[in-house]
Amino acid sequence: MSPDELQSHMRALGYRTQNDLANAIGVSRSAVSLWLEGKVGVPRPVAMLLRMLLQAQRRAF
């Protein structure tokens, strides 16, 4: 998952800040920051979780 894709998923899921996402998925805000800056790749389980949440949200509406 690219930093742009992560940002897009965050917005679509209603996470307005890095801290919002970090709290929701149980990681540190600094980890989210590193992912968004592209310094560290988004771990595969996190990317999968965000994609699943987005799909579930789309199906609910």
Regions from the PLM with identified roles:
Residues 1-14, 48-51:
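A short, Lys/Arg-rich alpha-helix, primarily the initiator
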Residues 44-61:
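DNA major-groove recognition helix of helix-turn-helix/homeodomain DNA-binding modules
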Residues 26-41:
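Recognition helix of helix-turn-helix/homeodomain-like DNA-binding domains
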Residues 17-18, 29:
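Helix-turn-helix DNA-binding elements, focusing on the entry/boundary residues of the two helices
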Residues 20-22:
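Short alpha-helical "recognition helix" segments of helix-turn-helix
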